[in-house]
């Protein structure tokens, strides 16, 4: 089965088969963490920008570490270190990134819909790493992965969601 999606913006855009493929791929890569040398050439030659315009510890460090272990070249910036503090718009920032011919932009922003705006203004793949209270598909996938690892299946399960969204206000 092939994965035919360019972006990861909203988990509801994916079929059950897509999600299973993502989880199975993650499991296959998880063994890299057990190696003495925790690096594979999967993304060698690819450039990823982590544009975190909202504070993040776990999500940002997880992306940065995964990119390094998959041999991607990455650029990390956001918030007060960008020209947005001088009034530059998200679209202007994305247009600058487009000039660098990057392959993927990981977006974390407090504004709902920001990752979607990036998809409309860049040829690069876009991954939503959270957009305020709106969406956090990578967290949803991590939660599903944990359930899948422990239960082996999602069918017939009831779930309660407790979040720390107040921290994102």
Residue ranges and their predicted role:
Residues 46-48, 156-159:
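Nucleotide donor/acceptor-binding cores
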């Amino acid at each position: 089965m092939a994965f035919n999606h360019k972006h990861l913006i909203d988990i509801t855009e994916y079929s059950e088969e897509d999600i299973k493929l993502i989880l199975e791929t993650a499991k296959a890569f998880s063994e890299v963490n057990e190696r003495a040398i925790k690096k594979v050439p999967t993304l060698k030659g690819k450039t990823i920008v982590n544009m975190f315009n909202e504070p993040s510890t776990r999500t940002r460090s997880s992306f940065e570490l995964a990119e390094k272990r998959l041999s991607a070249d990455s650029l990390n910036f956001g918030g007060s270190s960008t020209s947005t503090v001088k009034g530059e718009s998200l679209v202007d920032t994305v247009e600058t990134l487009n000039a660098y011919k990057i392959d993927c932009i990981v977006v974390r922003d407090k504004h709902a819909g920001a990752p979607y705006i990036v998809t409309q203004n860049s040829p690069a793949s876009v991954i939503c790493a959270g957009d305020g209270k709106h969406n956090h598909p990578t967290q949803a996938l991590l939660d599903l992965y944990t359930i899948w690892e422990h239960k082996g299946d999602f069918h017939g399960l009831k779930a309660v969601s407790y979040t720390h969204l107040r921290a994102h206000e």
